[in-house]
Amino acid sequence: MHLLILLVVLLLERGQTSPLNLNTTHLEGRDQRQLSLFAVVNFPNLKCTTKTGSTTYGTCISTSECTSRSGSASGTCAAGFGVCCYMAVSTCGSSLSYNNTYIQNPGYPSTYTPTTTGTCVYTVNKASSDVCQLRLDFQTFSGFAVTSVGAKTDSMAAAGQTGKNPPTISGTNTGYHMYVNVGADSTDTATLTMTWGDIATAKQYNIFVQQIECSSAYKAPQDCVQYFTGTTGTIQSYGWAGSQLLAGMDYNNCVRTELGYCGIQYKETSGTSIDAFAIFATITNTQIALAALAESTDGVCSAQGTMVTIPMTSLDGVSPLPIATNVPPFPTEFCGGLFGISTGSVATPVQSNQRPFNVHLFTSATPTLDSASTATTGFSLDYTQIPCGI
């Protein structure tokens, strides 16, 4: 949708010109001496950065439209012809119908402690019929209680009306994002449901909701819950920031193949205070110990039902591994206390040339423990795309 601003300029002398440098259409009257010049200024309603900070966003629209949307003007845009309109909802049961809107806890920016157990539901209506997905950016997501074995006491569930819904998450997820597929009909909606089981812990959430059109270059492939772009980046499992792998996870983390790149390398994130790879479940974890273990012929990772899956990996992405006990030539499943394709005590990078690039996490519905009966953290993996021909 484009905003039309009608400026009326009274010209008293022939030859006077409009000072506008935006896209304009001029309409001249018949009177050459007293001439009304109408300039219709068009600018798209794009995401803008508010004056409150570089990570707070709004939509560039007119002042009057911002007021009609119950937003607040925070800085100007479109060469001063528009305002950056900040929009947010925080009351349980609220609905939103505009792009670039925040969903926040009641009383935000203060924390929120519910007085009773129950749910808090927000509804997202499509801003246009061309919208296929929502992208949720968790600028703040903390205080959602989760037990030391991964069971979700508090949770957030996002649901659309088509495709597979994202997993229900809990714990600390500040800085993460999530894609939600919505239906094809213009009246289709999506919901975010907060469920409170712990009424003693203060919670805080500030979720930026972007509506992604079907033709957008940033539309995620089907069933990609996290979608990363760029030749380098870091993929983290939900809850890792709070040192907790969540039970009942089943979702894809996808990386867009950039132009001129044919392979990808993954390795543990270094220098973190949180264990970068700890994927265990409540089976006989003594057989896994604290070493990395790829999918074995006796199916240890599959048997425990908690694992990271990466298609067709090897040390160089091309050559199969030497025949070894319990390690297939192109491992696909990873679990244990170190990431890699070695059963030693050192994590190893792995490569894959199979596209699309995809890291899948599956965790058992049974709460997860490591071999020392303490919480297992999940994973944080750095990726680097590899140019074709290398």
Residue positions per predicted region:
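Domain-level representation of secreted and single-pass membrane ectodomains enriched
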Residues: 2-390
